[in-house]
């Protein structure tokens, strides 16, 4: 399946690398949300290639609650760091991941 340049990929199941990325930005997500998460499990994600990579990740945060994160991973030549650049609250498992 081809992807439009700058478009987002088809959803994929989260793996260990995506979970590590989420664990890394969890404190920033908690600060943004104004609360602590006992559960913070990556479920699915999509990517968008820009001058780096945007990861749009569905996170289970307990009960039926989910959040969507946009995590930007810089190119290695720019340090390769991670940045939480967006967060959507009040999501469900069924809500599709879309650009935000």
Swiss-Prot record:
GO cellular component, one term: cytosol
CDD domains hit by this protein: CY (cd00042)
Domain of life: Eukaryota
Main location: cytoplasm
Sequence motif Secondary area of contact, location on chain: 48-52
Site (Reactive site): 6
Induction notes from the record: By bacterial infection. E.tarda bacteria causes significant up-regulation in head kidney between 12 hours and 24 hours post-infection and in spleen between 24 hours and 48 hours post-infection.
Record keywords, A-Z: Cytoplasm, Immunity, Protease inhibitor, Thiol protease inhibitor
Tissue specificity: Widely expressed. Highly expressed in liver and to a lesser extent in spleen, gill, brain, intestine, kidney, head kidney and blood. Lowest level in muscle.
Sequence ranges assigned to domain Cystatin in this UniProt record: 6-88
GO molecular function, one term: cysteine-type endopeptidase inhibitor activity
Location in or out of the cell: Cytoplasm
One Pfam family cited in the UniProt record for this chain: Cystatin
GO biological process terms, semicolon-separated: cellular response to bacterial lipoprotein; immune system process
Known function: Thiol protease inhibitor. Has papain inhibitory activity in vitro. May be involved in immune responses against invading Gram-negative bacteria.
Family membership noted in the UniProt record: Belongs to the cystatin family.
Name of the protein: Cystatin-B
